[in-house]
Amino acid sequence: NRTLQRAFPHPPMRLREREQVAWLSQTMARELDMDPDLLRFDFQDDALSPAFNVTAVQSKEISALLTLAQTLNVRIAAVTPDACALQRLLPFIPSGRQCLVWRDESQWLWATRYAWGRKSAREATTLHDLAATLSVVPEHISLCAEGEFDPWRAVTVRQPPVPPDGYRFAIALGLAIGEIR
């Protein structure tokens, strides 16, 4: 997992957005013992507490992507970690569920309203193992799988043919939906 998620309490004084960015950059760099210029991050206010939820990555982790985009004259507005894309499907999971999970051969990707992440399949071999590591009741998890949650529910108008094994497209559909505000 090469991204870092942390919550940082708001600073004691009120700051404008540019000052918030500078303050968070310095705070993250100090916490990680890194040069602030080596970090890329995004943040949002925590809805439940006076804090910022920050997602950060080392610049080197995305430098190849940025170089390729520049070569192709593509302007990148945002880089979205794969598990984060699952958050965009949360409004479509059944009532009473609070976590959406997708799995391939090597990893679990998961998202709740306030957090997201990845666990290797070695760390959590079953859905119950994953639920335990996330401190979530298994019955509150929707799994993107055949006979379980179908991410195509998020698409109101579908043109046939819809691919079989639609659950495999959860990340792509989450990215395509974009940010829901």
Feature roles, as predicted:
Residues 1-181:
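Hydrophobic/aromatic-enriched cytosolic interaction surfaces used to assemble or bind macromolecules
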